[in-house]
Amino acid sequence: MKQTLWPLTRLTSLVLTAVFVSTLSAQPRVIETATHRFVEAQAGVWLGTGSGSVYTMSNVMVLVGKNDTLVVDSHVTPTAARALLDALPALTDKPIRYLVNSHYHFDHAHGNQAFPAGIEIIGHEYTRQKLNGEAGDVLEENTFRSFSDPVALTVANLERLAAAETNIDRRSRLQERLKVQREYLAAIAEVQPTPPNI
């Protein structure tokens, strides 16, 4: 029996080693910028998340084609969208031709206005109607207000916490969060909903 198990154990060990080695080589490419972390899901298909230095709120997808680039969603504010645009050269030198709005909510489409003139913004007809005001003012809807209205209180709370904190490291982290939230509060005022154009 021992002689039968030994080859089986060796075979199992070899298979597990091969699987382990193949997973090491299959690790996705990751590119980090000052504002974003991009993970390549497939060749030319990137998932982008904010690094925390700018309030982005939502993820983005970037598809790099043969001649140009398509971006899915534009983040929560023009400031966050500009940070994304500044980060994209780390992925590609191909121009952005398309921006796709997955839907009209503020955290996916309120960065549209920061994208270069001439790009095609693609979205559902309802997204266009919501962002151009035909179907109500998105800046007055509960979806937007429930997230944007409390930001001033968040800033005040962080100011109070940072001022009272005696631990230097914790105070530094609070001050960084405060900086990001202050910038987000200022960026909210800049939002001008910009609808899809195709």
Name every feature range the model reports, one short phrase each:
Residues R37-A90:
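Conserved beta-strand hairpin/beta-sheet module of binuclear metal-dependent hydrolase folds
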Residues V30-E32, V54-T56, E190-Q192, N197-I198:
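Short solvent-exposed loop/turn micro-motifs enriched in small/polar/acidic residues
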Residues T33, Q42, F115-P116:
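Short, well-ordered coil/turn elements that cap or connect secondary structure elements
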Residues A80-R82, D86-N197:
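Active-site HxH/HxHxD metal-binding segment of metal-dependent hydrolases
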Residues M1-L8:
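N-terminal secretory signal peptides that target proteins for export/translocation
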Residues R10-T23:
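Bacterial N-terminal signal peptides
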Residues R29-V39:
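Blade/loop signatures of beta-propeller domains
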Residues L24-P28:
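Boundary at the C-terminal end of the N-terminal hydrophobic targeting segment
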